[in-house]
Curated annotation (Swiss-Prot):
Catalytic EC class: transferase
The species this protein was found in: Alkaliphilus metalliredigens (strain QYMF)
Domain of life: Bacteria
Family membership: Belongs to the pyruvate, phosphate/water dikinase regulatory protein family. PDRP subfamily.
PANTHER family (alphabetical): PYRUVATE, PHOSPHATE DIKINASE REGULATORY PROTEIN 1, CHLOROPLASTIC (PTHR31756:SF3)
A Pfam family it matches: Kinase-PPPase
Keywords on record: Kinase, Nucleotide-binding, Serine/threonine-protein kinase, Transferase
Catalysed reaction equations from the record: N(tele)-phospho-L-histidyl/L-threonyl-[pyruvate, phosphate dikinase] + ADP = N(tele)-phospho-L-histidyl/O-phospho-L-threonyl-[pyruvate, phosphate dikinase] + AMP + H(+); N(tele)-phospho-L-histidyl/O-phospho-L-threonyl-[pyruvate, phosphate dikinase] + phosphate + H(+) = N(tele)-phospho-L-histidyl/L-threonyl-[pyruvate, phosphate dikinase] + diphosphate
NCBIfam families, sorted: PRK05339.1 (NF003742)
E.C. number(s) listed in UniProt: 2.7.11.32, 2.7.4.27
The protein's role, per its UniProt record: Bifunctional serine/threonine kinase and phosphorylase involved in the regulation of the pyruvate, phosphate dikinase (PPDK) by catalyzing its phosphorylation/dephosphorylation.
Binding residues annotated for ADP, in chain numbering: G151, I152, S153, R154, T155, S156, K157, T158
Protein name as annotated: Putative pyruvate, phosphate dikinase regulatory protein
Amino acid sequence: MNNENLVIYILSDSIGETAEQVAKAAISQFDTEDYEIRRFPFITEKHHIDEMLQEAKKENSVIVFTMVVEELRNYIMEEAEKMQIRSIDIMSPVLHAMGGALTTTPKREPGLIRRLDEKYFRKVEAIEFAVKYDDGKDSRGLAKADIVLVGISRTSKTPLSMYLAHRNMKVANVPLVPEVTPPKELYEVPSQKIIGLTTNPIKLIEIRQERLKALGLKNEASYASMERILEELEYAEGIMKRIGCPVIDVSTKAVEESAGIILEIFRDRGYNMPNGR
């Protein structure tokens, strides 16, 4: 056995990154460069553990491991002790402490953190998508969207896009304005992916008047007039009928409620939701 060079064996039933980072943090506290780290990820069988231990036995070694599967964790501890190999269980003390605080038991499934990371990045991607393709900014996004929302101004298109993005849905939205022809890409999107948003004209007048007030403008602007609102609603209704998409009245609904209806529509159609729900 070489007493000078330390070999740190990293064993994990996942990728082993946690154990390696802890080992590196610990070894940095010592004034030495005479060490080597060997990482062995995805250890799921006892015979793999046996192979690592036989190698470690020949050297001045320490085993640092993260095993959430209790059977494998116990096996490493027992076999390492028999062979007089130093071993450190990184995960179990943390699981034990958290289990006591939460009064529940851990799942003990390898790789869960990777799944959480993947879900997080899907959400970030969906949020970035919603921002990029909000308010008809770039019609090229319509073909890539999971959901396309259409409606006149102040029908909750943007809040709904962001809410659904937090459910990992890529959402684009297109404003419908009588003076502006909808992009041709809108008619190329399958109608099953499009949701129309409408509202009560009285409610919309109130919302738009509040909007004008916030901007320091007078309520007399045509934007908040009944005549203009009815014109917009009629125009939007014609577009939605042409598309053949379902229409949701958002006038009395919170964003969460409207989003729930949209997701239910897609589930009923058999769409595989990105967040698996």
